[in-house]
Amino acid sequence: MSPQSKVFVLVLAGLERDALAFAHRRYPACEAVILSKTELRAGGWKSQLRILRQLKGEALLIFTDFLESLQEPILFKSTVLVHRCRETVLADSSGSFEVSTRVGFLGLLPRSLIAALTDAIVFVCVWIGLQLFLVWLKLWREPKPQVGEFDLAFLCPSQGGLGAPGGALTHVTGFLSGLAKEGARSALFCGQPLQAACDVHIVSGSRRFHLFREAANLSYNIRFIAAVHKLLAQERPRLLYQRHGRFLFAGALLSRLMGIPLVLEYNASEDWMAKHWDPARFIPWLRLCERVSVKAASLIVVVSNPLKQQLMEVGVSAERILVNPNAVDPEWFHPDCGGAKLQQDLGIQAEEVVVCFVGTFSYWHGVAVLEQAIRSLLDRTQRASCLLKFLLVGDGPLAPQLRNALDPYARGGLVTFTGAIPHKSVRMYLDAADILVSPHVPMPGERPFFGSPTKLFEYMAMGKAIAASALDQIADVLEHARTALLVKPGDPGELAEAIQRLACDAQLRVELGRNARKVALASHTWQQNAKRVLAYGVDTMSASDESSLLRSAVSVGSVPSRRTSSVRQNLR
């Protein structure tokens, strides 16, 4: 096959099968070659240029879920100047597409130069502004909670990132539902439509006038501050709450401008993530934004003790940190919620034992370990006393590798890949399973595992048997042989043995599942999670001398004795 008969496909978002279908429709005579997004991102810009220069064929197809939400469209169109294909095509799941050729790109040069100049101005202004803000922080008095028209304003100063199923979306919607059940009034301010148990205010933005997405994110913070400040001036909240992320500083500035305490939800250091997992550009700006957010926060909410230790190592006092693990809505995740029908739809037989994994197909979720365990178990099926079937729910950077490795078993009906599904549908797949697995692996460099997987608590609430890695917080939440079978992290042999043991012992599955749900209901609901955050604001207002003691004592299960809802009614 000649080089001219190839089309290279890079899937940024959306489903790979949709991208391949588009490629075959537009280029029916061409061979579609998938490019690895993970390898491109990990290699840096020099490696990316080298890979692009090696592409020779009909087209480079860059595929996403929605063209309107595509970051850095000008940069992607400019790839036509680097590779040796005839054209670059940007396409999305709806079938919309834009074609860029070398001649056509000349018309984009003026716009590209303006975008580059705009980005330069944004980077310089933000750098100077945030450096001055750090100086002013030393002079400003830290704001204290005061009586407000409502309890909490949840800030998501990012133009995207919450629309796709995953832990971030689950945490945001779960926390907001917990606030509502606790009787608190909240409002969400974000850059995209989102279904939540509160009023949602959309702050529009634009990426089309920027060359780099980092500049677009930084400038969006400024737009976000102006819009939210105007809205909150009309109806003031008692607390600001922001989920920490890359290039975010809006919550910090709004807190000091309006004199409202900021609660920062801190799930990881973005600087550390950029070094070890998810490469980033413009690192000095990323670090500066993180420093500003941490310095300005009155309370930092972390999901695990290792994260608390990391913050204390960089100078954050223990009194400013609340350990508050992720949680679950047990009214949504519960046994007998559609699994039986799904089993029929999937052709699962009564004698088969279903093992389910839900999550991102990435390294730290342990999918490579799971793959080895599955191969080991299915290769010895003929010697086993029970029939196993695996249900793998989700998507991610290692999905193509996992699909290829398990393809013989998938074709035999022993492994089912569902791809990404809406979070509201996850419970049916969990309910269809007999065993749920969470094979997380250790962090690089022997760093403590700092995560708090939301799926872990969803597993528990479903009342199913769990096989999980004995890893930091996972081992703190689960108890071996009482609520789960815990195995050595990164050991496919131990994972396989645990699955085999559960598969052959139905009574053990029932006991572990029943105990796990009891623990989830007692300590790990979103309502309890939200209550611990609200207690900070209520107790600071009612007794400032008691606040330090309360915050340092709060941890998993130690919920304040006074009901925040009754105190809040008095404040109103």
Predicted feature descriptions by range:
Residues 1-35, 131-195, 556-563, 567-572:
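N-terminal subdomain of nucleotide-sugar transferases
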Residues 381, 393, 400-430:
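Nucleotide-activated donor-binding/catalytic signature segment of Leloir-type glycosyltransferases, i.e.
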Residues 153-156, 349-375:
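Conserved donor-binding/catalytic core segment of Leloir-type glycosyltransferases
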Residues 97-112, 169, 222-226, 258-263, ...:
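Nucleotide-sugar donor phosphate/pyrophosphate-binding loop at the beta->alpha transition
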Residues 456, 480-481, 485-492, 501-507:
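Conserved acidic donor-binding segment of nucleotide-sugar-dependent glycosyltransferases
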Residues 494, 501, 508-523:
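A short, well-ordered alpha-helix in the C-terminal region of glycosyltransferases
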Residues 189, 436-438, 458-461, 465-468:
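Short hydrophobic beta-strand element within catalytic cores of glycosyltransferases
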Residues 306, 327:
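Carbohydrate-associated surface elements
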